[in-house]
């Protein structure tokens, strides 16, 4: 089984248990803390992936790091991952869990690129427009891309909305080349 599929299955199971047990908010907070630690410690990620470190030691490492920092139920889950030889999946499980939470809350991520920095008002207007268009809450990541010349591009999942001047010029070039002389 691929690691992505396994990560998704563990994330779904954790979400279901957390909802049924009424501790979803706490688990979500705990996983955020764990994700921050994993992002800041390449050595920990390597240790969790290492086949040279046995299951018990991985479990002890996780327990030492997260004891008194995460809820007991979350600790049971991460130790379960270690004992099932799936500690290397922890970051992937957290990522999948966050995606499931977003899906549950009707939130989608949008990657917005613009030629110049958008004002707060422009960014808010764009996010509102995307929200109306998709019927979902938008979490936008704004970035500059000077190659655009002007305008914006928005990527939501597999959909790209290209309102850039460079795209408009490319389309104009194609239409001019396609016309018979």
Swiss-Prot record:
**What gene is this protein translated from?**
atpH
Query: Which Gene Ontology terms of cellular component type are present?
Result: plasma membrane; proton-transporting ATP synthase complex
Q: Tell me one GO molecular function of this protein.
A: proton-transporting ATP synthase activity, rotational mechanism
HAMAP family assigned to the protein according to its UniProt record, in alphabetical order:
ATP_synth_delta_bact
What is the name of the protein in this document? ATP synthase subunit delta
Q: What does this protein do?
A: F(1)F(0) ATP synthase produces ATP from ADP in the presence of a proton or sodium gradient. F-type ATPases consist of two structural domains, F(1) containing the extramembraneous catalytic core and F(0) containing the membrane proton channel, linked together by a central stalk and a peripheral stalk. During catalysis, ATP synthesis in the catalytic domain of F(1) is coupled via a rotary mechanism of the central stalk subunits to proton translocation. This protein is part of the stalk that links CF(0) to CF(1). It either transmits conformational changes from CF(0) to CF(1) or is implicated in proton conduction.
Identify the Pfam families for this entry: OSCP
Tree of life domain? Bacteria
What is the protein's species of origin? Chlorobaculum tepidum (strain ATCC 49652 / DSM 12025 / NBRC 103806 / TLS) (Chlorobium tepidum)
